[in-house]
Amino acid sequence: MSPQTETKASVGFKAGVKDYKLTYYTPDYETKDTDILAAFRVSPQPGVPPEEAGAAVA
């Protein structure tokens, strides 16, 4: 029989979802000549922040 080991949930990976605006959303980003831009019209459902709805497109 193999020895038992203890696994700590806080080590390595922590499950959960972070707000998009905390990780990738950069409102003051300035475009470069090499950027490719696309436009999407997004209408968030009631209670959903606009940047979170936009993250669904990204």
UniProtKB/Swiss-Prot annotation:
The superkingdom listed in its UniProt entry is Eukaryota
InterPro entries to which the protein is assigned, alphabetical: RuBisCO, RuBisCO_lsu_fd_N, RuBisCO_lsu_N_sf
Q: What is its EC number?
A: 4.1.1.39
Q: Residue positions of the PTM N-acetylproline?
A: P3
One annotated Gene Ontology cellular component of this protein: chloroplast
Reaction catalysed by this chain?
2 (2R)-3-phosphoglycerate + 2 H(+) = D-ribulose 1,5-bisphosphate + CO2 + H2O; D-ribulose 1,5-bisphosphate + O2 = 2-phosphoglycolate + (2R)-3-phosphoglycerate + 2 H(+)
Q: Could you state one GO biological process linked to this protein?
A: photorespiration
Identify residues that carry N6,N6,N6-trimethyllysine.
K14
Q: Where can this protein be found? A: Plastid, Chloroplast
Which Pfam families does the record cross-reference, listed alphabetically? RuBisCO_large_N
Keyword presence, Lyase: yes
Tell me which stretches of the chain form a coiled coil. Answer: none
Keywords tagged on the record: Acetylation, Calvin cycle, Carbon dioxide fixation, Chloroplast, Lyase, Methylation, Monooxygenase, Oxidoreductase, Photorespiration, Photosynthesis, Plastid
In the UniProt entry for this protein, what further remark is given in the free-text comments?
A: The basic functional RuBisCO is composed of a large chain homodimer in a 'head-to-tail' conformation. In form I RuBisCO this homodimer is arranged in a barrel-like tetramer with the small subunits forming a tetrameric 'cap' on each end of the 'barrel'.
Q: What is this protein called?
A: Ribulose bisphosphate carboxylase large chain
The species this protein was found in: Weinmannia silvicola
- Top-down, what is the taxonomic lineage of the species of origin? Eukaryota, Viridiplantae, Streptophyta, Embryophyta, Tracheophyta
Gene name, Swiss-Prot/TrEMBL: rbcL
